[in-house]
Amino acid sequence: MFSYSDFCSIGTAMILSATTFLMGVFFSNMPYDYHLLFNPNSTQEHFDLALRHYQILHETPLPVIVTLCVVAGIGLVGGTIKVFKPNPELQMFEYCSLGLYVLAICVFLTNVKTGIDCSVSHNWGEVTENQGLAVIASSNIILLVMFAGVIILQIGLWYSNWDLQKRLKEFYAQEEREAANAGKKTEKVDNAKKNDNKSKGAQKRKNAKK
């Protein structure tokens, strides 16, 4: 039977696998987003290329979208497993990790997904097309930062649990050594008492013979 700690290990693997996969998906937009956000010499051509890129993403086949949703769901399941019975000393980090993951999904749905739809409809609301594309690019950067935060938290939690288990093993080993030493001392005292009693008994018998 699996213990809860075993399920937590599986949950950590699920979170890390899903998060790194999603980071790769959004990082693939960086060749277009970089020029919109960080290139001071960006031209309208860069915005046109980014627009075309997001228009192509809008035509993503349904099986690919379903796969992306399944991967995101795996991360959510892993996070739920870990917050079911969290370590009281580390539970805030577990909650923050799951919260960051959920918030990243919300940012995708409200900013990136909406922006991709707008790239096709050209209905950008109160902002210009270039500003809307910059918002999508900024949202992708925010997503990468959030997912990186999830990974850092999970690595920190794993290390904390590993260090705790290591310290517990050392503590129990020390307790066993102390108990063994105490047992040896007690045995020596008992043997000394027995020898002393034997000596006294022998002395009494000698005195009785006299």
Curated annotation (Swiss-Prot):
Residues 178-210 are annotated as: Disordered. GO terms for molecular function: unfolded protein binding. Keywords: Endoplasmic reticulum, Membrane, Protein transport, Translocation, Transmembrane, Transmembrane helix, Transport. One of its GO terms (cellular component) is mating projection tip. Pfam families: SHR3_chaperone. The chain crosses the membrane at residues 10-28, 60-84, 92-114, 131-160. It is found in: Endoplasmic reticulum membrane. Residues 178-199 have a biased composition (Basic and acidic residues). Signal peptide: none annotated. One of its GO terms (biological process) is COPII-coated vesicle budding. The keyword Transmembrane applies. It comes from the Eukaryota. It is a multi-pass membrane protein. The keyword Endoplasmic reticulum applies. Residues 29-59, 115-130 are lumenal. Residues 201-210 have a biased composition (Basic residues). Residues 1-9, 85-91, 161-210 are cytoplasmic. Disulfide bonds: none annotated. Involved in amino acid permease processing and required for the efficient translocation of structurally related amino acid permeases from the endoplasmic reticulum to the plasma membrane. SHR3 may function as a permease-specific 'adaptor' molecule that functions in conjunction with the SEC62/SEC63 complex. Yeast cells may require SHR3 to expedite the processing of permeases to ensure their rapid expression at the plasma membrane in response to changing environmental conditions. Monomer. Present with 6510 molecules/cell in log phase SD medium. This is Secretory component protein SHR3. It comes from Saccharomyces cerevisiae (strain ATCC 204508 / S288c).
